[in-house]
Amino acid sequence: MEPLLSFKSVSKQYDDMQILDKIDIDIESGYFYTLLGPSGCGKTTILKLIAGFEEADNGDIIYQGKSINHLSANKRKVNTVFQDYALFPHLNVYDNIAFGLKLKKLAKSEIKRKVHEALKLVKLEGYESRTIEGISGGQKQRIAIARAIVNEPEILLLDESLSALDLKLRTEMQYELREIQSRLGITFIFVTHDQEEALALSDYIFVMKDGKIQQFGTPIDIYDEPVNRFVADFIGESNIVEGKMVKDYLVNIYGQDFECVDMGIPEQKKVEIVIRPEDISLIDAKSGLFEVTVDSMLFRGVHYEINCIDRKGYEWMIHSTKKAEVGSKVGLYFDPEAIHIMVPGETEEEFDKRIESYEEQDNA
């Protein structure tokens, strides 16, 4: 099946700064995608290229099988929800949503029907005559979405569009966005630097750094099997330690062998090991895989964040529902499945092949 939208080796430069470096992406119809990465990684530039606000320096942007490199923004079946919403303060809610429809010179009855449907979808029926100054931040967000979807775009772009909301409202809007996307069935492409937001909202995530795609996959794939240290650090909390692959299903960490589920990596190959804090249990010091000293503890609401130091001076973070006394000796335990092996220098393609070989082995 042909992708709805593709970037083929797309590059973009501002002055002497390389913003996008030979980007390749495929976007299928009807899914929620997120471009995730730190400030300056190029994610908003991708949105601008899709919307037609910028042109690529090199490469091709393909929409439904045709190049749209030089297609003007107003001819693209794309709408954008901006970070500041970009609502017209001198127009009421109805006229804000109807603005694009009036430019198309639709009949008044058709405009009224479409505006009503859009307001119903974002759960703001009856707000037609409200002023923009008289509604809350969350309501402005919904009006901006209604104004975008009323034009029936194939793709909806959202540029950091939840960042101005407080935590509670942002969480509520995450549910709203997922529901709206599911009901409309159109493609959403969302930009954020917030990894929790990306994990909660997305069908698929592109993790970006320095103008390049570091990893693409489902939230679970990226969280459970990060391709490199950057992705492991950026997506959630991680314990990352160095080690060597002894043989298939056995890795050495700090001179001690541990069972794992990885295979196909050369013996004695230097690797990096990721163990998530929630996958580690605190037990009696003598019963653990190794002993650590509790260095600090913070209460995070649903769990305690406990930092420990092992005998070699390395720090370990554990998320536990149990308290631990600072200064006490405890044991750490984790299952072989909790160990995720990363091979330094491994490309995403090589990484994907390795992970696929595990699945083939499991199904054999």
From Swiss-Prot:
This is Spermidine/putrescine import ATP-binding protein PotA. PROSITE patterns: ABC_TRANSPORTER_1 (PS00211), ABC_TRANSPORTER_2 (PS50893), POTA (PS51305). Its main location: membrane. The gene is potA. Part of the ABC transporter complex PotABCD involved in spermidine/putrescine import. Responsible for energy coupling to the transport system. PANTHER family: SPERMIDINE/PUTRESCINE IMPORT ATP-BINDING PROTEIN POTA, SPERMIDINE_PUTRESCINE IMPORT ATP-BINDING PROTEIN POTA. It catalyses: ATP + H2O + polyamine-[polyamine-binding protein]Side 1 = ADP + phosphate + polyamineSide 2 + [polyamine-binding protein]Side 1. It comes from Staphylococcus saprophyticus subsp. saprophyticus (strain ATCC 15305 / DSM 20229 / NCIMB 8711 / NCTC 7292 / S-41). GO terms for molecular function: ABC-type putrescine transporter activity; ATP binding; ATP hydrolysis activity.
